[in-house]
A protein has these predicted regions:
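Periplasmic c-type cytochrome electron-transfer domains
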Residues: 1-170
Length: 170
């Protein structure tokens, strides 16, 4: 989930919802990566560009962040791409940072996340905070986990038969 008591994750969770992070000040990461839709936008392809909006959950275990960009091997490197892309969030880095620095509560959140930083509200701090929040997003529970949690209808009939056979045969 996005709730966290860790200052870096908390700042990142706040930035995921922060519209001022975009060049036009009107778009947040969560507008496209909607928690209620599995951190996607629910569409087969996102406009513009024709690619889908990838889910944000489960990225802590990934080593690559896109088949089309094998050079992107860290989440931070992947996050820099939409932040700099005019078709997505932006590239107005200085104007974006100025808007963020104008909010004393947000500057204080950066201070809690980066207590020893000589300068607060930098692009790299923002990327690090976003990465910490995204790394903390857990994948949704699979059918077997839901079954163990008491959801008797979680497994499809064939899976229930397989599970019964597994239990029977040990």
């Amino acid at each position: 989930g996005l709730e966290s008591t860790q200052p870096l994750e908390a700042l990142g969770a706040r930035l995921l919802a922060e519209r001022r992070l975009s060049a036009d000040g009107a778009t947040s990461c969560l507008d496209c990566h909607q928690p209620a839709r599995g951190y996607t936008d629910g569409r087969a392809t996102a406009a513009p560009g024709g690619l889908n909006t990838p889910p944000l959950w489960g990225l802590a275990a990934r080593g690559r962040y896109g088949w089309f960009s094998p050079e992107v091997t860290t989440l931070e490197a992947q996050l820099r791409r939409p932040l700099a892309d005019p078709a997505e969030m932006g590239p107005l880095r200085d104007a974006t940072l100025a808007r963020l620095r104008a909010d004393p509560a947000l500057v204080a959140a950066y201070g809690r996340a980066f207590p020893h930083a000589p300068v607060l509200v930098t692009w790299e701090q923002s990327v690090a905070a976003l990465a910490a929040a995204v790394h903390a997003i857990e994948p949704p529970p699979g059918p077997y986990a839901r079954l163990l949690a008491g959801d008797a209808a979680a497994l499809a009939p064939a899976a229930r038969r397989g599970q019964a056979l597994f239990v029977e045969l040990g």
